[in-house]
Amino acid sequence: MVTKESLTKEVGVLYGKIYGYTDVGGDSVLEFMDEWLSDEGKYDLFMEYINNDEFNEDTSLVEVTELINLLYHILDGLREEYNM
């Protein structure tokens, strides 16, 4: 069963993978991610997670799932950008 807790953990794992690219790309990786999140209207939702290590109670599973899908796209974009 998919729960907000399991989705929250997945967001953390994906962010860890994205953050790992800063070893290669420096701060430009985080700027790339922030810009993409902003363009898709998910920056505030992601910051909610970063600031609290969880999402607010009123955050829906759909919103978190959309964020996860976007983080996968960002990760794919970074892999392509850095040929990894």
What are the roles of these predicted feature ranges?
Residues 19-84:
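Acidic, low-complexity, intrinsically disordered interaction modules
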Residues 1-28:
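Short terminal alpha-helical segments
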